[in-house]
């Protein structure tokens, strides 16, 4: 009878699984690409700066800027190399963190990011993707540019999170219980986007949930299944990204959301995503959103503490076409503003912060 029961269990298990491949344990990549002293110090300092901005102790603007997604490490390094002097130039007014997104949530199907599909040819060499991602994060941090990423599952943070200075939970996963639990244990600040329908309640609920301790299932650095116990994350905040009914970056929208935040007892301020529904998915409109947000800041508003921008070396986007060479430095997911517009945008944001200081000191 015992043998028969075992056979039944096996026969009914994994009936839709094609195959199962082993993944490298996190420790293998942490030992291969350890964080240098310089990189570790940068991450620690940037997390501290983000904490101070989020908690109203620093009047600078937190700026998360970079490609929609990373598909070409060489272009990512060039972007970081160009961003470094701008981070230094505007350090008194902006805390600039590079957007380094390796995983892409999809509404239906599509390329899921460099970790899942590093070679863009449907081979799904996930172990290689993890290696490439960690090596790239190491190189970017060693350049003196801190990194930001989106967290989509409970396991990849064990491979990469020590290099992340700020994290995001996307609009499609903000309502997810496991992502709220994950955020409660991440060592960096985490932004929750409002829902795709534009609603902000799910994000505010997520912040409250992530502030509390949780238990969840993940893996250890050695790859063993484990129960993770968290302390709670006090550095969570909302990101306004617009919704099905339109943008939500206007002064009126920000005021309304801040009133809701104030009711929760938290500091009433927000991060604004210049892209996605706030730009109606038209990448050039990010510059219009920037101008509106800069006006709010320059007139003295302290309700916007941070912004998010989709930017690349070359503006626009491209499709992956077999046999056709890719345009170097151009997105293969959401369209981005190009480098020249990115430089102008950062100058405008810096000027707005300086103007706010003058407006509030009078």
From Swiss-Prot:
Q: Please verify whether the record's keywords include Lyase.
A: no
Which GO terms fall under biological process for this protein? amino acid biosynthetic process; aromatic amino acid family biosynthetic process; chorismate biosynthetic process
The family database entries (InterPro entries) matched by this protein are listed as:
Aldolase_TIM (IPR013785), DAHP1/KDSA (IPR006218), DAHP_synth_1 (IPR006219)
Q: What top-tier enzyme class does this entry carry?
A: transferase
Kindly give the Pfam families that the UniProt entry links to this protein.
DAHP_synth_1
Query: Which residue ranges run through the membrane?
Result: none
Amino-acid biosynthesis recorded as keyword: yes
- Catalytic activity as recorded in UniProt: D-erythrose 4-phosphate + phosphoenolpyruvate + H2O = 7-phospho-2-dehydro-3-deoxy-D-arabino-heptonate + phosphate
Q: Which SUPFAM superfamilies match?
A: Aldolase (SSF51569)
Q: Which UniProt keywords apply?
A: Amino-acid biosynthesis, Aromatic amino acid biosynthesis, Transferase
Superkingdom of origin organism? Bacteria
Record-level Gene Ontology MF annotations: 3-deoxy-7-phosphoheptulonate synthase activity
One GO term of the cellular component aspect? cytoplasm
So, what pathway does this thing act in?
A: Metabolic intermediate biosynthesis; chorismate biosynthesis; chorismate from D-erythrose 4-phosphate and phosphoenolpyruvate: step 1/7
**Enzyme Commission number:** 2.5.1.54
PANTHER family documented for this protein: PHOSPHO-2-DEHYDRO-3-DEOXYHEPTONATE ALDOLASE DAHP SYNTHETASE, PHOSPHO-2-DEHYDRO-3-DEOXYHEPTONATE ALDOLASE, TYROSINE-INHIBITED
Q: What does this protein do?
A: Stereospecific condensation of phosphoenolpyruvate (PEP) and D-erythrose-4-phosphate (E4P) giving rise to 3-deoxy-D-arabino-heptulosonate-7-phosphate (DAHP).
> Which NCBIfam families does this chain map to?
aroFGH, PRK09261.1-1, PRK12755.1, PRK12756.1
By sequence similarity, the record places it as follows: Belongs to the class-I DAHP synthase family.
Q: What is this protein called?
A: Phospho-2-dehydro-3-deoxyheptonate aldolase
Provenance organism: Haemophilus influenzae (strain ATCC 51907 / DSM 11121 / KW20 / Rd)
- Give the encoding gene's name: aroG
């Amino acid at each position: 009878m015992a043998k028969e029961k075992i056979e039944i269990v096996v026969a009914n298990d994994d009936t839709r699984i094609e195959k199962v491949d082993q993944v490298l344990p996190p420790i293998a990549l942490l030992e291969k690409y350890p964080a240098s002293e310089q990189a570790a110090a940068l991450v620690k300092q940037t997390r501290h700066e983000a904490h101070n901005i989020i908690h109203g102790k620093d009047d600078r603007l937190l700026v998360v800027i970079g490609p929609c997604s990373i598909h070409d490490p060489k272009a990512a390094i060039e972007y970081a190399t160009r961003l470094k002097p701008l981070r230094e130039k505007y350090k008194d007014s902006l805390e600039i963190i590079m957007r380094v997104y390796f995983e892409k949530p999809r509404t239906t199907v599509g390329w899921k990011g460099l970790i899942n599909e590093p070679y863009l040819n449907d081979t799904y060499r996930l172990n290689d993707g993890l290696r490439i991602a960690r090596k790239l994060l190491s190189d970017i941090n060693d350049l003196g540019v801190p990194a930001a990423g989106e967290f989509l599952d409970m396991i990849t943070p064990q491979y990469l999170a020590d290099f992340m200075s700020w994290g995001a939970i996307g609009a499609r996963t903000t309502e997810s219980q496991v992502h709220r639990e994950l955020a409660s244990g991440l060592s960096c600040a985490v932004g929750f986007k409002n829902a795709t329908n534009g609603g902000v309640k799910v994000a505010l609920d997520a912040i409250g949930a992530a502030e509390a301790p949780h238990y969840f299932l993940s893996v250890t650095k050695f790859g063993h299944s484990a129960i993770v116990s968290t302390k709670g994350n006090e550095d969570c905040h909302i990101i306004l990204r617009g919704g099905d009914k339109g943008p939500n970056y206007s002064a009126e929208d920000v005021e309304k959301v801040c009133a809701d935040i104030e009711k929760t007892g938290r500091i009433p301020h927000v991060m604004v995503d210049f892209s996605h529904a706030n730009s109606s998915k038209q990448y050039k409109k990010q510059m219009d959103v920037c101008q509106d947000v800069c006006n709010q800041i320059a007139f003295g508003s302290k309700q916007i503490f941070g912004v998010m921008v989709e930017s690349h070396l070359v503006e626009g986007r491209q499709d992956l076409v077999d046999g056709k060479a890719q345009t170097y430095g151009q997105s293969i997911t959401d369209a981005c503003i190009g480098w020249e517009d990115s430089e102008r945008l950062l100058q405008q944001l810096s000027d707005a912060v300086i103007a706010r200081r003058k407006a509030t000191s009078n």
